[in-house]
Amino acid sequence: MNAPKPVVLCILDGWGLSDDKTANAPYLAKTPTFDAIMTKGPHARLITHGPDVGLPSGQMGNSEVGHTNIGAGRVVAMDLGQIDLAIEDGSFFDNAALRDFIARTRAAGGTAHLMGLVSDGGVHGHLNHIIAAAQAITNAGVPVVMHAITDGRDVAPKSAYGFMAELEDRLPKGARIVTVTGRYFALDRDNRWERVQEAYDAMVRGEGRRVSTAHSAIDYAYNQSESDEFITASVLTGYDGMRDGDSLFCLNFRADRAREILRAIGEPGFADFDTGARPALSALLGMVEYSDAHNAYMTTVFPKRDIVNTLGAWVARHGLRQFRLAETEKYPHVTFFLNGGKEEAEPGEDRFMPKSPKVATYDMQPEMSAPEVTDKFVEAIGAGYDLIVTNYANPDMVGHTGDLKAAIKACEAVDQGLSRVIAALEQAGGAMIVTADHGNCEMMIDPETGGPHTAHTLNPVPVALVGGPAGVTLRDGRLSDLAPTVLALMGLPKPPEMTGESLIT
């Protein structure tokens, strides 16, 4: 039997499965196409958290982890666990890059600036890592100031008081908090430079909303109806910015949301907004590598590990053509992360990236750019590609707003797109795996607080096969089983590095 063409992997980002229907956007939405996929064809469930995706037990998955595991076809040990272990066994404190950072700062007579997400969400960073870094640096006699980025997205929307109190309690002598900024500003990833500039001005220039303490920054924000994610850049009394000879250590271990603020601080010739005269920093260090471009002006504590023979690399090695599609919010996931942290496209790999809508939050436009994604998706199905990988961002990005009605609309927008995609797929004679990278919008109300739930979940995600071989079924599995399944549909062997197994039975 001939292999179907194209073979499609469609990722509904943040679309989880839950038996609790109370605030379950996919369940409450009118999704006739998805419902038909899950009732008429082969379907199963995938685990997206904890050791099954290379994370510590109980740690929720996320889009970076999910797409990395999907593309690798094997369980990839993620940075969170590696960093935790290095702190636990003491090797973090002896790391050569960290020691060099300390030596350069001390030689310049500077202050070490730490920047990181202050929560235990474990998606972009972790409070424990901030404390370890502060201890290592202050133990060497170098003063430390902390640029605290509040979360409210991977943890409860108004949990900053507790995390800030823990940070203040655990910071060693010689370290203090000097700015408090919501991640909406400091961790943008969609070229909203006006947001990034607010964070930059506070951290680098010491300009922003003036407050006396970190807690008063949160107080003021809550009085202005700003939840943690949206806290206006606030500068504590006595801080007036970075100086020549100072240094910066970014503690975030996920690349996509750290890139823009680091570019503004360190990239030679940066011109996306007026930074003013930037200080001559003695050192710029990252917990991980953020991109090849960042490597030109930063060092790293944990260099990138090569993931060889990813799905994309293996398909390219067999001389086949592939297409990657997502709007800008999720574009790095179907390219950089799916390709194992590699920026460049594989030979024969084409890409398209519709711009995400320019709105303050995506509950204001829950359809996002799904119509344009679908237009290009349908076009690609008829264009002769062997493999197509598409990500619909809506369930995750709107799920993060905590707005149930908007999340329902987001799911419905995706379902409308799926209807058109399946029609095109049937006409072309292709096959498609529909799945998700983690849960989110199936839990829009926090069961503990009764308030909005904005974080990812530990729930399983769907996996379904459309247009596959007759009579097959799918088994339950994990994300690393998806690439071997795709290769099986394409009639290709899997590379020896892929330890995942095809879901088709």
From Swiss-Prot:
Disulfide bonds: none
Catalytic activity: (2R)-2-phosphoglycerate = (2R)-3-phosphoglycerate
Binding-site positions, substrate: 124, 153-154, 183, 189, 254-257, 330
Isomerase found in the keyword field: yes
Keywords, comma-separated and alphabetical: Glycolysis, Isomerase, Manganese, Metal-binding
Cofactor(s) the record lists: Mn(2+)
Molecular functions per Gene Ontology: manganese ion binding; phosphoglycerate mutase activity
InterPro entries, per the entry: Alkaline_phosphatase_core_sf (IPR017850), BPG-indep_PGM_N (IPR011258), Metalloenzyme (IPR006124), PGAM_B_sf (IPR036646), Pgm_bpd_ind (IPR005995)
HAMAP family documented for this protein: GpmI (MF_01038)
UniProt protein name: 2,3-bisphosphoglycerate-independent phosphoglycerate mutase
Provenance organism: Ruegeria pomeroyi (strain ATCC 700808 / DSM 15171 / DSS-3) (Silicibacter pomeroyi)
Gene: gpmI
